[in-house]
Regions:
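Conserved N-terminal structural module of periplasmic/extracytoplasmic solute-binding proteins
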Residues: 3-80
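Extracytoplasmic/periplasmic substrate-recognition and gating elements
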Residues: 41-42, 265-328
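C-terminal capping/gating helix-and-loop segments adjacent to ligand/active sites or protein-protein/ligand interfaces
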Residues: 49, 287, 330-331, 338-397
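A structural signal for short loop-to-beta-strand junctions that line the ligand-binding cleft
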Residues: 62-63, 71, 100-135, 164-170, ...
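Hinge/lid segment of periplasmic solute-binding proteins
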Residues: 76-129, 143, 152, 179, ...
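Extracytoplasmic/periplasmic solute-binding protein
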Residues: 119-122, 152-206
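Glycine-centered hinge/linker elements that transmit conformational signals in sensory
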Residues: 200-234
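Feature captures C-terminal
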Residues: 425, 429-598
């Protein structure tokens, strides 16, 4: 498997021998490794390069605007307004792949169509809702809820027994969206004025709620709060604590999703409850694709690349590939007709809803998470009127995108590992030099993947900065040369060290500034060198600055120097932004010398 950064400045679509190269930009580096391998094996005539866009549509827009878009791009957090902005750069999948487009369930592509052009295909969807400890329900004779009123009653029964009814990390944006959309879909968004609002939202209309819509959402939250289903304490709970309480039998229900395997530590039986409404017939599955895929319009202008991409898409959305995606999930729901996905015992209770395709797909714009969080927080922490609730939500949901230019780049630098020099990322060299200049450090070591996208010449907005920099805190320490060598050795060791269940090493490769490094062929005896080429003095003291990933690696590898580092007030992003405002970025510098075997 070939892994890279978020893109490169040249070589798009290069061939390797007689093979075509297809670039696929995924939303991270680590998920669905078995599925990636399956796709590669089904396309032996192609070389697939997997890139990482960090689940950031702005990264895709940034690269597309500079003519450096991957052939296939995927995103998990699908935002309608961001997708509309990217649409001019995307191929028409309905025209270019009509057979695959026709395989999707009627209506499932509505939110992925812009100006009559099908721009995205959704991969199988996860379901989010309530996990109930069925053993507790049976033990105390509590009815498994099928309506919102029955959910209130169940929570009341458990609270009277000293058991928390429902625990939810209400401050998380994705949970707020689940509460507002999932528990109001059947009663509002699926009919009448609510349906009209949703149609407009998906078509690029105003995201602001009407007076009626705001009142409906506020009333649902208010009722859940008054009944004890939701509590102010839910704003401060985190997912780990919620799960621990559920596993120990202290909580009867939690919010959870189907895209991972859940094994109750207590051995209790668990059952999934979908989103509820006024009647049992209002039960509905709240879903969203584990990713959605689009194709570069430019790619489809090349007949050979177009055929290669069609081949990859056909494999990606085949029933067999979707089942591979489901191997590490309790259940996924396919948006394609005729693809039956496996479901675990936890989801047997909603097998009928799955068979009936009684679901909806989560709808977002770039502000939906923050707007939902603010609205839920206001209701749980206070007592807003319907008008106050609606005004707050609308203020957040309609916040305009900040397009102000914050600086300009005078250079270009790629971010793909090994693109210009072995084991180096040129853009990461630029970042490391900026940190050194701002902190006065003798040496800087940062995770090279913090350079999340290539640097292009020209103006930059805040969205561009978030696309370019995977921000990390910075730490500093005064170390002896011997201690510094130990830190560097473990930073390199981290490139071949894997944390539990992670398919990526804890460090990609460190980028350096202020010093260079000589890397031996056998991995033993790597040395740091001063700017004049001499070795560092083991007894001298050096001011070192590292990024958070490097510090984590030191702690993970139990390096005794990890505790010597203290947090700096600035981050990678803030220092880069300050330097960018001056319009003079440093040129990339070589920081590794590799031993050449004779």
């Amino acid at each position: 498997m070939l892994l890279s950064g978020c893109g490169k400045l040249s070589g798009r679509g290069k061939t390797t021998g007689n093979e075509l190269t297809v670039r696929i930009s995924m939303y991270n580096d680590i998920t669905y490794s078995a599925w990636r391998t399956y796709v590669e094996k089904q396309c032996p005539n192609l070389t697939i390069i997997w890139e990482n866009n960090r689940n950031n549509t702005q990264s895709l827009i940034y690269q597309a605007r500079h003519g450096d878009m991957a052939d296939i791009v995927t995103i998990r957090r699908f935002e309608t307004d961001s997708a509309a902005e990217l649409a001019p750069y995307l191929a028409d999948l309905g025209r270019d792949n009509p057979e695959l487009a026709a395989s999707f369930t009627a209506g499932s592509l509505d939110g992925f169509t812009f100006g009559g052009k099908i721009c995205w295909f959704p991969a199988p969807g996860m379901m989010e809702g309530i996990y109930a400890n069925a053993t507790l329900f049976d033990q105390y004779g509590v009815e498994m809820p099928q309506t919102l009123e029955e959910l209130k009653n169940a929570c009341g029964r458990f609270e009277a027994l000293g058991i928390d009814g429902l625990s939810i990390e209400a401050s998380a944006g994705f949970r707020g969206v689940l509460l507002l959309e999932g528990f109001n879909y059947a009663g509002y968004f699926a009919k009448g004025a609510g349906k009209a609002w949703l149609t407009g939202f998906l078509s690029g209309g105003s995201p602001a709620l009407t007076e009626e819509g705001g009142a409906r959402l506020a009333d649902t939250l208010r009722e859940m709060k008054q009944a004890g289903v939701l509590e102010q304490e839910d704003l401060s709970i985190n997912a780990a604590d919620s799960l621990t309480s559920f596993d120990s039998g202290k909580t009867a229900m939690i919010m959870n999703g189907s895209d991972h395997i859940y094994s109750p530590k207590s051995g209790a039986s668990c059952r999934f409850i979908p989103c509820l409404g006024e009647t049992a017939a209002d039960q509905i599955l709240y879903t969203y694709p584990i990713f959605s895929a689009a194709v570069s319009k430019e790619t489809m202008n090349d007949s050979k690349k177009a055929e290669a991409v069609r081949q990859v898409l056909t494999v990606m959305y085949s029933g067999a590939a979707q089942k591979v995606l489901a191997e590490d999930a309790e259940a996924l729901i396919s948006y394609n007709d005729g693809v039956d996905m496996p479901i675990s015992d936890i989801y047997r209770s909603v097998s009928g809803l799955i068979a009936e395709k009684k679901y909806f797909i989560r709808f977002l714009n770039r502000n939906m998470f923050s707007a939902s969080t603010a609205a839920v927080k206001a209701m749980l922490a206070g007592d807003p009127s319907d008008a106050e609730f609606t005004e707050l939500f609308n203020q957040k949901i309609t916040k305009p995108k900040d397009t102000a230019v914050v600086g300009a780049s005078n250079i270009e630098a790629g971010n793909q590992l090994g693109e210009d020099r072995p084991l180096e990322r040129s853009a990461a060299s630029v970042l490391a030099q900026i940190v050194q200049g701002a902190t006065g450090a003798d040496v800087v070591l940062i995770e090279s993947k913090c350079a999340a996208a290539p640097l292009y010449k020209g103006d930059y907005t805040k969205d561009d900065l978030n696309a370019v920099i995977a921000d990390e805190p910075l730490y500093e320490a005064e170390l002896t040369g011997a201690q510094l060598s130990s830190v560097f050795d473990d930073a390199i060791l981290g490139t071949t060290t894997y944390s539990y269940l992670n398919i990526e090493p804890i460090v990609d490769y460190p980028a350096l500034s202020g010093m260079t490094a000589f890397l031996t062929a056998n991995g033993r005896g790597d040395t740091l060198r001063l700017p004049d080429g001499s070795a560092i003095d083991a007894n001298a003291r050096y001011h070192a600055v590292i990024s958070q990933t490097i510090k984590f690696a030191l702690s993970y590898l139990q390096n005794e120097n990890a505790a010597s580092f203290s947090l700096l007030p600035d981050t990678l992003l803030s220092l880069f932004t300050a330097r960018l405002s001056l319009g003079t970025l440093p040129e990339p510098q070589q920081y590794f010398e590799l031993e050449v075997l004779q």
